[in-house]
Swiss-Prot record:
NCBIfam families assigned to the protein according to its UniProt record, in alphabetical order: PQQ_syn_pqqA
Family: Belongs to the PqqA family.
Pyrroloquinoline quinone (Glu-Tyr) cross-link, chain position(s): 15-19
Job description of the protein: Required for coenzyme pyrroloquinoline quinone (PQQ) biosynthesis. PQQ is probably formed by cross-linking a specific glutamate to a specific tyrosine residue and excising these residues from the peptide.
Pathway field: Cofactor biosynthesis; pyrroloquinoline quinone biosynthesis
Protein name: Coenzyme PQQ synthesis protein A
Listed GO biological process terms: pyrroloquinoline quinone biosynthetic process
Superkingdom to which the source organism belongs: Bacteria
Keywords in alphabetical order: PQQ biosynthesis
Family matches, as InterPro entries: PQQ_synth_PqqA (IPR011725)
Amino acid sequence: MWTKPKFEEMRLGFEVTLYISNR
């Protein structure tokens, strides 16, 4: 299980990347 802060940061970055890519 990953650390909570790291998991949130990775997920946030992933979502942002997808958002920019979809733009």
